[in-house]
Amino acid sequence: MSSIIRKRLFFTSGRPLGLILGLSLVLVSGLIPMRGLFGQSTTYLVTELTSGDGAQVPSKLNNLGVIVGRQAGDGKGVPQATFWNHSHSNGKHLGGFAGADYSSATGINDTGEITGSSNTEAAILPFIWTEKGGLQRLPVLPGDTCGQAVAINKHGDIAAYSSGSNGARAFLWSRKGGVRELGTLAGGNYSKAHDLNDSDEVAGVSGSLAGDRAVLWTKDGNAHDLGTLPGDFVSEALAINNAGEVVGYSKGPNGMRAFLWTKSNGMEELGILAGGSSSRALAINDSGTVVGASATQSGDHAFVWKRQTGMLDLNDAASLAHGTVLVDAHAINRKGEILAMGGMDHGGMAPDNHRCAPAPPLSFLLTPTNAP
């Protein structure tokens, strides 16, 4: 990846403590010994992943720290599905279907199998990529004309959805079983998958008689309505871990709220950041750590949530260069590494009528350097 900017952040079991020294193109050694004074802390190393022109857009990472997304790499600004690792720090392009001018990787497992979508002359379609087989087109549901893959598990099974005259429909693809439609809740006319775990449990959203609902499809083929938070009318599940814990958002008269759903406790609200008006949970790892975004008075801020600490603003621990703020955290792996998106703080940029164009988004990798 291009110009690397690294900073150290601290989180205690309570409030974030602040910035550790250093902004450089290389790792700096300045370290303030806060841990002894303030108790157990989590330290993060923050690495800027993007080049500053918006050409690189990381989306997911596996438990080995390999990152997938898309990158404009053909000299014409055409986005291509890409992965980054220690051997390919500048990115390895996966290509696309014949004639494609767009492809994007949206999931990777720990064996390096990657899934995503690429367009053709007629439509966008899902793919699987392997080191041996390269990029291969996946089928969609009968009668559908386009589709997108969203996640892949350790077995190489893929959660996806396709669309046609009957609307969007979630499905699960496997090498042994091919395409299997996941169905909808009673009265629903569409469904979308967003994530799956190693037990082939799929999290997503389905229409229903009561409106859009967060749904969990279990391996037995049943679709389970996860409900909403009290008083709300719609919900959507965005991620699931290997314990079957699901996160997403519920929406009603009081706005959008991040939720965690577990088999034992059902759906519980995760709250909002101080002064905020809404929140949404975007990812969860196998330890139950949740990341996402919460709207505040100064715009969206990325958060991390743990049961022992509650919701913490990632920006309380660091002031990133040039007025940049972390606006959402959208992926987290077993090691606690977090992918976050950055943008310009309102206080760090010119008014709208003084700017020629909005600043391109930035992406960051937050790597814990000690156990929480």
Model features per residue range: what roles?
Residues G14, G18-L19, L25-P372:
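Residue-level hotspots at or immediately adjacent to binding/recognition sites across diverse folds
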Residues M1-G14:
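N-terminal secretory signal peptides that target proteins for export/translocation
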